[in-house]
Curated annotation (Swiss-Prot):
The gene is rbfA. GO terms for biological process: maturation of SSU-rRNA. It comes from Picosynechococcus sp. (strain ATCC 27264 / PCC 7002 / PR-6) (Agmenellum quadruplicatum). GO terms for cellular component: cytosol. Keywords: Cytoplasm, Ribosome biogenesis. Monomer. Binds 30S ribosomal subunits, but not 50S ribosomal subunits or 70S ribosomes. This is Ribosome-binding factor A. InterPro entries: KH_dom-like_a/b (IPR015946), RbfA (IPR000238), RbfA_dom_sf (IPR023799), Ribosome-bd_factorA_CS (IPR020053). It is found in: Cytoplasm. Belongs to the RbfA family.
Length: 131
């Protein structure tokens, strides 16, 4: 098993290389259907598996199409990583859609919708209701 420092370094290298592949090397038109960004890469302790979390901006149809294209390109990504990063074995690559940014936006929107009232206004309103 690799130490945590090595795992972290490999994770950041994979993130950088896959980002470059998304911009330059992956030719599948489905991947271009939505704007894709890599939010995180989790590499297993033995460096054999890499979960690549992607955030996709666009409609639901574009997201589904983009994920389809990314899944179809997993073999290409694994081979290319093997050529660009010096590892004994190329890690198995798995793309996972990350909706945490979308959830964060939704939470911020809900918080902004709440009306935060001044305590004095609340007291005045309550006293009016009692009369």
């Amino acid at each position: 098993m690799a130490n945590s420092r090595r795992v972290s370094k490999v994770s950041s290298l994979i993130k950088r290389e896959v980002s470059l592949m998304l911009m330059q090397d992956i030719k599948d038109d489905r991947v271009g259907a939505g704007m894709v960004s890599i939010t995180e890469v989790e590499v297993s302790g033995d460096l054999q598996h890499a979960k690549i979390f992607v955030s996709i901006y666009g409609s639901e149809e574009a997201r589904a199409e983009t994920m389809e294209g990314l899944r179809a390109s997993q073999g290409f990504v694994r081979r290319t990583l093997g050529q660009r990063i010096r590892l004994r074995r190329s890690p198995e690559v798995l793309f996972i859609e990350d909706r945490s940014l979308e959830e964060g936006d939704r939470m911020i929107h809900l918080i902004n919708q709440l009306e935060i009232k001044d305590p004095e206004e609340l007291e005045a309103q309550e006293s009016e209701e009692m009369v």
